[in-house]
Amino acid sequence: MNGGNMPQVHSRILVGLLMILTMMPVSAFAQSTSFIASSTPARIPSVANPCPRFAPGSVIHQPSALFSQNGVLSVQFSYQSTTDSANRTLYCFMTPAGLENPTLHVRPGDHLIITVTNNTQPLGFMMMLDAPNCGPGGNQMTFSSLNIHYHGTNTSPTCHSDEVIKTIINSGETFQYNVAFPSNEPPGLYWYHPHVHGIAEKAVLGGASGAIVVDGIENVQPAVSGLHQRILMIRDQPTVQFQEQMLMESPGGTPNGIPFQDVTVANISTNTMTDTTQNPPVTTYTPAILHMEGGETQFWRVSNSTADTILDLQLRFDGVAQTLRVVAVDGVVVNSQDGSQPSGLIPVTHFRLPPASRVEFLASAPPASVKLAQLVTLNILTGQNGDDDPNRPLFNVQLVNEDDEAAEDDRVGQFSSVNLNQKRFAGLATAPIAAKRVVFFNENQPTQFFMDVQGQPEQPFNPNAAPAITATQGTVEEWTVENHTLENHEFHFHQLHFLLESQNNFGINRDQEPPAITGQYLDMVEVPNWDGNLDHPYPSVTLRIDFRGHDIGDFVSHCHILNHEDLGMMNIIRVVPPAKSANTNAARKATVSAKTGSSTKRSGLLPTSTGVMGNMKMN
C-alpha cells in the first residue's frame, strides 16, 4: 500500500493524474439527471479553532450527535482545514455550533439534508470535467475541491445525492445535498467522507469523516436493546517521524514493523513516537482510555474510517484474547435481510476490518482482577509490496462506577416490535444470474493503479471516461474480483451491498479467510496479495452484486486504500433500465477489442522490484 504523506501528496497525485490524462482517450460521460435541483443555499461561515484533537491517553467520549425529526435531518457544515503541532494538515466538517464531524442519526425512509460550504483555502487547478456536471464548481476540479460520499448507504447516485464522479464544490462555494434513505435501509453503522478523485486520501487522512447511524437496529437484533453504545471512529494520519520523508508507493513499506500511519481513536492519537536510533527501532504507544462499568456489556460500533490502514481488532484481558459477539458488518445485521430473522450473533476472537468497513459487536467488561484490558489491532502484513504494521494498542478499558459514566450514557433504543420491513436482500442468494464478470486489481508502481475488467483495455480511472461496465436494473450479477498484485487491496462498491459467496485461493500466502463475513451482505471486502508465482492462482472473492434496487445512473467501484483509488484503481458502473440495456451492451461490444484467454491463468504480468509490471502474454 505505502501511501504518501501530506507534504508529498500534491506532487504525487499530480504526476499520477498527468500520466492518466496523457494515456487515456476522453469519452462522453452520461450522468443520471433524475433529481430536483435545490435552491441556491446560503453560505455557511467558518468556525473558529476548527478540527480539535485530543492528547494521547485521553478518555474516549461519544462524538456529538444530531438526530432526525419528523423524517428529516437538516445539517449545516463548514468544511475547514488547519495544521496541528506536528505540521500535519487537518480537515473536518464543523457545524455553526462548533461540533466536529457529528454523528448523523436517521431512520429508514428519512431525508438527510446537508448544506456545506467549502471554506478551505483555494489550491491549484487539477483537471477539467466533461459535461454534464453537478455542483457549483462546474467543470473545474482543483486540489481543494470537495464533495461528500455517504459510504455504505443504498442511496441514489444522482446529483444532490450520493454522486461522487462529477460533483465538485470548490473553495468558497456552497452546495446542498438531499439524500433520501430507502424505507428498507438496513439499520446500522455507515459513514461520510470526501470523495474527490485524486485528493480523497489527503482529506480522509486529515480527519474529514463522521458516522451515520440508521437507527432501529434493536428491532432487527433484540440482543442490543437498551445497551450502552459506543461510536468508535478509528482514523489514521501521517506519523510524526515521516512528515518530511518520502514514503511513496514502494516495496516493503516502513522498515522493521514501524507503523506506516499513526492511528487515532475518537481523534486521540495512539502512536506517539518511534525511536529510530535504536536497532530495531522502538515505537512508543499511548493508548486512549475507554470507560466501562464493572459487569456490563457494551455495544461497540467501530468504523475503520482510515484512508489506508487495515485493522485486525482483538480484545485482550491480560494478554488473553476475549470473545467478541458480532452483531453487524457494514451496516447490516449478520444473518438478516434475506427475509428471515437473525439466527444469532457470531462469536470471534478477532475481526479483520478493511479501510472503510464497519463492525458492530458486543464486548463485556473485564473482571476487577484483570490488570490490563486492551483493544489492539494485530500485525498486518499486506504482501511484498505492501506494509508490515505491527501489533499496537488502540485503547485500554478502565472500570468506573455508574455515576462516573452518567454523562456518557448513550443507549440503544428499547426493542418494541420485530421490524418486518428489513428484507432488502431477500432472494439475492438464489436469484438467477444475469451476467458473470471478472474484474481485477492491477498496478504499475509507483503511480499507476488499475481496476481492470476482463476483456477490456487496461486504463486507470478517468472521470471523463465511459463506464467500464453497464448493468441492467432489476438483475443480479456474479463477479469474481481477483488480485493480480503483490499487495492487498480492498474492494468497495458504491450504492449497494453484495453477498460474499466465497473467498478463494487465500492460502497461497498462508493467509486465512477473515472470519464472520462469508455469506454476509457487505460493501467492503479484502482480497489478499498474489505471491507472484506464475503457477499459482490469483486470490479472489466471488460476489453476488445486487442491481435489483430502484436506482439507475453512474457510480463507482474501487480499492478503498485511498492512495490506490486516487492513483487510478477505480471504474465507473452504469445501471440502466431494462429497455436500454441490450442496445448499450451491443454498442460497447462493437467498440471494445476483447482480450483472449481466461484471467484465472497467469497473464504474464511479472513481479519486479517495483511492482507487478510487464505486458507479456502467456499461452
Task: Please report, for each region that a protein language model flagged, where it lies by residue.
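Low-complexity, Pro/Ser/Thr- and charge-rich linker/hinge segments at domain boundaries
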Residues: 215-230, 402-431, 578-590
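N-terminal, post-signal-peptide metal-ligating segments of extracellular/periplasmic oxidoreductases
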Residues: 30-168, 174-176, 244, 248-300, ...
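Extracellular/periplasmic metallocenter environments
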Residues: 119-126, 137-220, 343-403, 485-489, ...
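Bacterial N-terminal signal peptides
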Residues: 15-25
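Active/binding-pocket-proximal capping segment
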Residues: 317-334, 484-520, 562-565, 574-579
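Bacterial N-terminal signal peptides that target proteins for export
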Residues: 4-15
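Histidine- and aromatic-rich segments of cupredoxin/plastocyanin-like copper-binding domains
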Residues: 155-170, 234-418
